[in-house]
């Protein structure tokens, strides 16, 4: 044992003093101090439970004692009579055994592999004991869940990730998936439930037993987001539902996660075997699958971007050469060849690596290096987390904790330990880059010689620019030189370290080589400089632009085309990561993929960290909007598709925000009790305006109205129970808050809820009955116009059906033609007076006569006027398809419908492009003359001429 460094000697003295001051003073042995100086967690636990120290002396921890955990836990739970006692006993047992594991780890009486097995088996024992106790309790209350033949059905639990692989770290959370074999109903209880309801309640109680913070702490943070459909999916699924999901919708990343999946409890009953057999074809393909490499490379790229975004320096899990890269290397072989090589189907990493060596897939020395590095990093991770029983993989910056880790790892000081760490991580990175590697940086031809270098580093005259910019006139050259000199002066005022200056000196000649030959060199450079000033002190992003020449070209192309994009990149430089993959940059996601991509993105953020969740939502939105804008700029996306993508993106964000708000509310109050007897959440959101009409722009706000379906006498089922309708009101308020909170990444969306019944004077959330009553008896014509463009954007099917029926009933109401014309005209006149341009030489594309709003009002009038005789006119909420319906049902001539559609799409396209230029919707009065003439003629025909004349 190495002598303690000075920082730990002081710590030892403090610890001895604290134990001496106990009511029954304890003197510590030398080996006690050797452990206690490394871990505040162990010290604190033994001060609270001094008898545990006697136990450690009398029965020192043994490497294989994990085999007795279930027996010891069974004894600890023998007297438990209720759930409160269960929660207390589970927490106490976990702390006691964690102290023993930390003790054995510090004294190295257990190897690192022993420690990982102990941690994993402890978690499994606690999960299974809690499940079994709660299963019996639920059966007493609700009866035993049975299939159609009366056979009792169990709850099976898949442990995912490191838990599944038997490699859990010291302060890990646990990833679980719940399943049950067959549908059916409970038998023998006080009340009958179907199996889905029974197992959902059991699952909720199990999560609470493990995850809830009490006076005794918690057992494990439980993460259920790896289940099918994530947080928005059922908590528990039948085997058939699981099989359907993974066969029809399973994603690559879910396949990788399933490699380590293991049934908790080691059960060998026929249900367990059936579930394993069901999942196996999804995980391991019968053929050799080389598509895995690119998929894993994409996942690694996402993680690397996350490290940059969250500023994760010194991260031994996610950093280059860290634990995650060793896991990726191993998974490559499992997923490519596992279907044909049973030896590669191991869940644990080290045995899989050994099989890789035996099969000759990697040289033995590389496998030995990877195995050694893995054990080094896992011990370091466990020692780091054992300091305070906190889940972290970031190395400490303070001298005390650095000394603890160096001592625990067997090094004389932090410098020596860090050198060994660097060596291990470099060895891992070499193998990773060879096997998976990021796409090679495309540095391209080095332009830093000659005049481009002089342009940055020397004082040049205008004449010196001529060879570089022969296409520019003198005024343009002069302006270019002024811009460069101002930038150089601004940079000199910034605090840039030597490395930052070195990288900037490499970058600027390359940038000039791309910008100077452009005809718009001045515009491009002025926009790029705003970006450069925002990242000049952040060397990581400068290095990205130096190493990836293609990324630099994309930055120049996009900033030159759009000041909006340039402003976004300058404000949020993390978006530069999106430029590394041109294939995805100019091709936005499939519209149906936004929800799944966002779900995967949020999996990397702790579910209980609201601040990180808010940042992640905003960063995802900005990244996707950048891709949509890139597709728009390059004309890869037509105008209708731009709005479609922006709308699908907004719907994905709404879904995620409501999920986050729901989780927070349920954690605080429980859920409304009426939901136990039904599907869904009794909550829906109506999208109005541009969201409802699939017509969102880059800066559109969201017009939302919230609906609830909850009886009057319902309360929530949590410890802090509140009225059910109060729950939904607070839920809606929480949703509004999550959208509008300003973080370092800005707000998510501006949300306007004023279209709700009675506007700002009305309740934020309406019952579906109150909404129907208001629309039938109190709503103005303009509110019925708004209903034309309304649709459900979030909600359970039952509420959606009710809303659709109300909408159709209102829109199909018989209306007198001339009165409707007058009311629509009057509303339009009010809007024009309020919003329209007052200048005769200006045309506001949105608000002025002959513009987009006139077209929208024509569409709304036609639906309100003719849906009574042709209800199918209410089918769509967007203007383009409304005009299509009008032509199909012979209400409007086909040529007129096509002309109005063309005018509408043309103007919308211009508004998108003006937004990319950060310009308003006001243009010269000469613009869109033909379109405005068509709109004016249609306006007169439908809204001015007597209805009988039409």
Swiss-Prot record:
<keyword id="KW-0460">Magnesium</keyword>
<dbReference type="GO" id="GO:0008882">
    <property type="term" value="F:[glutamate-ammonia-ligase] adenylyltransferase activity"/>
</dbReference>
<dbReference type="GO" id="GO:0005829">
    <property type="term" value="C:cytosol"/>
</dbReference>
<keyword id="KW-0547">Nucleotide-binding</keyword>
<dbReference type="GO" id="GO:0005524">
    <property type="term" value="F:ATP binding"/>
</dbReference>
<dbReference type="GO" id="GO:0000287">
    <property type="term" value="F:magnesium ion binding"/>
</dbReference>
<comment type="function">
    <text>Involved in the regulation of glutamine synthetase GlnA, a key enzyme in the process to assimilate ammonia. When cellular nitrogen levels are high, the C-terminal adenylyl transferase (AT) inactivates GlnA by covalent transfer of an adenylyl group from ATP to specific tyrosine residue of GlnA, thus reducing its activity. Conversely, when nitrogen levels are low, the N-terminal adenylyl removase (AR) activates GlnA by removing the adenylyl group by phosphorolysis, increasing its activity.</text>
</comment>
<dbReference type="GO" id="GO:0000820">
    <property type="term" value="P:regulation of glutamine family amino acid metabolic process"/>
</dbReference>
<dbReference type="InterPro" id="IPR013546">
    <property type="entry name" value="PII_UdlTrfase/GS_AdlTrfase"/>
</dbReference>
<dbReference type="GO" id="GO:0047388">
    <property type="term" value="F:[glutamine synthetase]-adenylyl-L-tyrosine phosphorylase activity"/>
</dbReference>
<dbReference type="InterPro" id="IPR005190">
    <property type="entry name" value="GlnE_rpt_dom"/>
</dbReference>
<feature type="region of interest" description="Adenylyl removase">
    <location>
        <begin position="1"/>
        <end position="440"/>
    </location>
</feature>
<dbReference type="InterPro" id="IPR023057">
    <property type="entry name" value="GlnE"/>
</dbReference>
<comment type="similarity">
    <text>Belongs to the GlnE family.</text>
</comment>
<keyword id="KW-0067">ATP-binding</keyword>
<keyword id="KW-0808">Transferase</keyword>
<protein>
    <recommendedName>
        <fullName>Bifunctional glutamine synthetase adenylyltransferase/adenylyl-removing enzyme</fullName>
        <ecNumber>2.7.7.89</ecNumber>
        <ecNumber>2.7.7.42</ecNumber>
    </recommendedName>
</protein>
<dbReference type="Pfam" id="PF08335">
    <property type="entry name" value="GlnD_UR_UTase"/>
</dbReference>
<keyword id="KW-0511">Multifunctional enzyme</keyword>
<dbReference type="Pfam" id="PF03710">
    <property type="entry name" value="GlnE"/>
</dbReference>
<feature type="region of interest" description="Adenylyl transferase">
    <location>
        <begin position="449"/>
        <end position="950"/>
    </location>
</feature>
<dbReference type="InterPro" id="IPR043519">
    <property type="entry name" value="NT_sf"/>
</dbReference>
<keyword id="KW-0548">Nucleotidyltransferase</keyword>
